Amino acid sequence: MRPFQLLSALAIFINLEAVEAAAYWDCDGTEIPERNVRAAVVLAFNYRKESFHGYPATFIIGSTFSGVGEVRQFPVEDSDANWQGGAVKYYILTNKRGSYLEVFSSVGSGNKCTFVEG
């Protein structure tokens, strides 16, 4: 391969990497970026219980979730910003490790959101 061909191949590879779609949660057609959800997981356990506009809320775990540990609820936004109070359109339920993680919509019928890999 000649040097100019190698440079072209590298440029194409870099552009393909940039175009790769990121993972997200589909909430009735609204996309919640995975990075927002992961940030909300961290925030849910960085704040003391109910210390930030009444969040994070903590739930008692029954035998259904054995091994999951404490589960917290925390709002998540569909934009690039973290939730700063006000109406809650979307929220997560998670444990500290993030091994149990669900996203829900409180808009409309309040459905569970679906994870879509990027």
From Swiss-Prot:
Disulfide bonds join C27-C113. Its main location: secreted. Residues 1-21 form the signal peptide. The keyword Iron-sulfur does not apply. It is found in: Secreted; Host cell. GO terms for cellular component: extracellular region; host cell. The keyword Signal applies. Keywords: Disulfide bond, Secreted, Signal, Virulence. Interacts in planta with the pathogenesis-related protein PR10. Secreted effector that increases susceptibility to infection in both monocotyledonous and dicotyledonous plants. Non-catalytic homolog of fungal RNases that binds host RNA and inhibits the degradation of host ribosomal RNA induced by ribosome-inactivating proteins (RIPs), preventing host cell death, an inviable interaction and demise of the fungus. This is Secreted effector CSEP0064.
